[in-house]
Design a protein with these regions (language model features):
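Aromatic-rich peripheral "rim/lid" segments of glycoside hydrolase catalytic domains that contact
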Residues: 97, 101, 241-242, 246-247, ...
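Compact beta-sheet-dominated domain cores in extracellular/mature segments
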Residues: 1-69, 73-80, 91-93, 293, ...
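Alpha-helical scaffolding within the catalytic cores
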Residues: 84-92, 106-117, 147-151, 169-185, ...
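Catalytic-core region of carbohydrate-active enzymes that cleave or remodel glycosidic bonds
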Residues: 214-269
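N-terminal carbohydrate-binding/catalytic regions of secreted carbohydrate-active enzymes
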Residues: 66-124
């Protein structure tokens, strides 16, 4: 649960191993900032003017040092993934092997009235593919309207979690850039940007080229949004993409291998999750059982820790400081 405060906070020390969200409104909405003390104590000597002596809400969770590799449509245990999500908010409890990430799939579902502390959930993904007319998120936003998503955003802020923007398709560049700009203008908080990617590459025998194409696509979004990127669905093409360049199982394995090594070497890319069920030659597991070459490679792959702590300027230290640990 979040703590409701009287507002007289201008500085604080967040101990290493915790994340805290501070907000102007008692329900967690309004101007807010999420802080993470991953690699050392975080000392904030002066809050921004929009929060200084105006903090009404704080929610604090233990931080988890999660590696980049994740899963979505396949069990995290089957891929030795470090985190996963399932397009829902289910009764998952904290697990020492992998982190469960919640999602607000569309505007009306699922409910965010949750006991986040009990569930051990620290991250929340925004709407799923609101730029895609076949998705519920598109319909629930009256045809994927960015303005409606921004107006509804305080509900997500109220959870007090680290919030991801709506996850668009790989054709949704303009949509995601638009919502980032509108959210910033409205004072809404977006902490990272999820994205989906299913593009093939013209040369099926050039895995490095496929990896560079993915990197350049993500770099364009990062340069526009200036926020960490999560690749929450991806594969080397799909059944709705360019069938003339469909890979065989070996070519798919090699392309995904090159892609995830490129992602591991990209500091602003926090997390990625393979999506398997896009034709048998792209799957992590065969329909009849057994793991594919790509699935085995992905399972064996060891990825680095995703989050990179950035220490903001501490400024001058006011006379009062608050050392935050864990609140219930």
């Amino acid at each position: 649960h979040g703590a409701v405060l009287g507002g007289d906070i201008s500085s604080f020390v967040l101990k290493r191993g915790y994340t805290a969200t501070l907000s102007r409104n008692a329900n967690g909405s309004g101007f807010s900032i999420n802080y993470v003390a991953a690699d050392g104590d975080l000392r904030i000597g002066a809050l921004p003017a929009n929060l200084n002596n105006q903090v009404r809400f704080i929610r604090i969770f233990p931080w988890r040092w999660v590696a980049k590799k994740g899963s979505c449509d396949v069990s995290p245990a089957a891929l030795d993934a470090h985190w996963y999500y399932n397009w829902n908010i289910t009764s998952q409890t904290a697990n020492s092997d992998y982190e469960y990430v919640a999602i607000k799939q569309q505007r009306w579902w699922p409910s965010l009235n949750q006991d986040w502390q009990h569930l051990g959930i620290h991250h929340l993904l925004g709407y799923n593919e609101p730029d895609n007319p076949v998705e519920d998120a598109y319909t629930s936003l009256d045809g994927g309207r960015v303005s409606i998503a921004v107006a509804a955003w305080p509900e997500l802020e109220g959870a007090g979690l680290r919030i991801g923007a709506p996850a668009v398709t790989d054709g949704g560049y303009n949509w995601i850039v638009d919502i980032i700009h509108q959210a910033e203008a409205a004072g809404r908080r977006v902490d990272y940007v999820p994205i989906h990617y299913y593009r093939s590459y013209w040369n099926k025998n050039d895995p490095a080229g496929a990896a560079d194409q993915l990197y350049n696509f993500l770099k364009g979004i990062y340069d526009a949004a200036h926020k960490p990127i999560w690749l929450t669905e991806f594969n080397y093409g799909a059944y709705w993409t360019d069938n003339a360049h469909d890979p065989d199982v070996t070519q798919n394995r090699n392309a995904i291998d090159a892609m995830i090594h490129k992602l591991d070497d990209t500091p602003w890319l926090e997390r990625y999750a393979i999506y398997s069920r896009v034709e048998w030659f792209r799957q992590t597991h065969y329909d009849g059982g057994g793991i594919t070459p790509m699935g085995q490679m992905y399972k064996d792959h060891e990825s680095p820790i995703g989050y990179q702590q950035i220490l903001p300027g501490e400024g001058m230290h006011p006379s009062a400081q608050y050392a935050f640990c864990l609140l219930y």
